[in-house]
Amino acid sequence: MAFAASQQLNRYYNLYKNIDVTFSKEVVSTLNFEPKQVFVRCSGGQWPCIINSASMTKAKIICGKKSGFLARLRSGITSVNIRFAFFDTEGKDSLSFFVAAKLVGISSYEAGNQDLVLITFEYTQRAPDDLIEKLGILLEANINSQKRRNERVVITPEISRKIGLVEKGTVVYIDAVPRRCLIRDLSFSGAKILLVGIANFLINKEVILRFAFDDPQSVFGIKGKTVRTEPVEGRKDLVALAVQYYPKNIPMMYKMYLNKYFSVVRKPASDGFGDDFLEDVAPASSFTPVSSPIGTNTAPLTPPPADSAPEQIS
């Protein structure tokens, strides 16, 4: 088991080591990152800072121009230790570690901002396994969500356990009205659900589909639109309803849960590969870093209670 884990970490590192992850509000939440416990240490002192972005080989931090840390750097100090900190939502011990790094450059944080600077550091040794694992899982899920966006995962009891889906039965809000439904299959871009109803009255409707996952526990909704209906064989009272998510409303957590299936699944035979083919999910040449796909200005969507109209989802 330890050998398999080591192989996976090496795979993450070799594939994704140079891809920057911007620590947007959503990424911070997804990784259980603890910004208040982050600081940089050098020359016998330590100062709080903000992680702007990080990869498995470097990090960019934000600090004030009047910071004593910046003065140390300008005095010729180039070696530092950056503290990363993560908390556990299920009450386990928190995780923190230092990463040794050297100064690469200092620049203005953003045009017009006279108070903050952006400082780039390069790690002087391979990143800790915990950082490689956390960034690797997130990056693989984000890449798979683009490369495999339309591949459907039929929800069986075994698949539900694997991806952490609490149950197939859930609630879908159709034009703000809650309806009970069953999840038949999922993809990174949508879902197919079964519910009682008349097809003509369910097409082209605004919906929010509610999900509950374990490991870690999370409840959220994804906003989308019904795009197609299909009859259910032997059940005239039921309709199969295809939901297409709005891309900007797909939480990173959803991608990570669903990717638990794709992270070890063999490619289907229909793609021209045998059952023993295990695909390495390498970033495509056109892949945009996580800095862009994960929105920095959208708050996670919280599903509305059943007795109220739904509201909307870094």
UniProtKB/Swiss-Prot annotation:
PilZ domain residues: 146-234
Protein name as it appears in the record: Cyclic di-GMP binding protein TDE_0214
Domain of life: Bacteria
Electron transport found in the keyword field: no
Record field: compositional bias (Polar residues): 288-300
Disruption-associated phenotype: Mutants are less motile, reverse more frequently than the wild-type cells, and form less biofilm. Invasiveness and ability to induce skin abscesses and host humoral immune responses are significantly attenuated.
Function: Cyclic-di-GMP binding protein that plays important roles in motility, chemotaxis, biofilm formation and virulence.
UniProt keyword annotations, A-Z: c-di-GMP
Pfam families registered for this protein in UniProt: PilZ, PilZN3
InterPro entries the UniProt entry points to: PilZ_domain, PilZN3
Residue numbers spanned by region Disordered: 288-314
